[in-house]
């Protein structure tokens, strides 16, 4: 029962509940370089589908994780890439998050080099998962796709994002 020999009910978190959650879809595409070869990152647009708890807010390509919580963020997507590297077929992309860009780049890099396949165009699965701790202040996330080593066109990026407030 609720009281008695089994004791009082526990705090939030028991039986798999959480403080709040957010589910959305993601989309973007575009050239990741300028004519002179300089990088041109492309922001990932976020569309809220459902949420509970009010701990996550979005605006265009920005996601705000409200302070006072620890969040689990998972992105699952598909992306189509095309090389523009002078008939070599090489391409490379990576994602940034506006929070820890160095880690994010290393964790998400997709690269094709060494094989000479002119005009290559490939579909890749993309996944990213990490914990963000917003103990003292809100965390503004801005996910962007950028080229890494080679001129690359992002023909499409479509996926989902799930955010869970763990406490």
Stretch-by-stretch model annotation:
Residues 10-13, 17-167:
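Extracellular jelly-roll beta-sandwich "head" domains, especially the C-terminal globular C1q domain
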Residues 1-6:
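Low-complexity/repetitive intrinsically disordered segments
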């Amino acid at each position: 029962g609720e009281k008695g020999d089994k004791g009082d009910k526990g705090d939030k978190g028991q039986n798999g509940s959480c403080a709040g959650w957010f589910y959305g879809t993601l989309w973007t595409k575009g050239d990741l370089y300028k004519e002179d070869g300089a990088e041109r990152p492309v922001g990932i647009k976020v569309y809220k589908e459902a949420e509970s708890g009010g701990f996550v807010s979005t605006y265009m390509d920005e996601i705000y994780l409200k302070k006072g919580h620890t969040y689990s963020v998972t992105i699952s997507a598909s992306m189509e890439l095309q090389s523009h590297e002078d008939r070599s077929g090489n391409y490379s992309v990576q994602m940034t998050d506006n929070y820890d860009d160095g880690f994010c780049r290393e964790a998400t890099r997709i690269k094709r080099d060494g094989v000479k396949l002119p005009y290559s165009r490939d579909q890749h699965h993309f996944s990213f998962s990490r914990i963000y701790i917003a103990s003292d202040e809100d965390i503004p996330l801005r996910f962007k796709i950028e080229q890494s080593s080679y001129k690359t066109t992002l023909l499409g990026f479509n996926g989902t994002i799930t955010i869970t407030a763990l406490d």
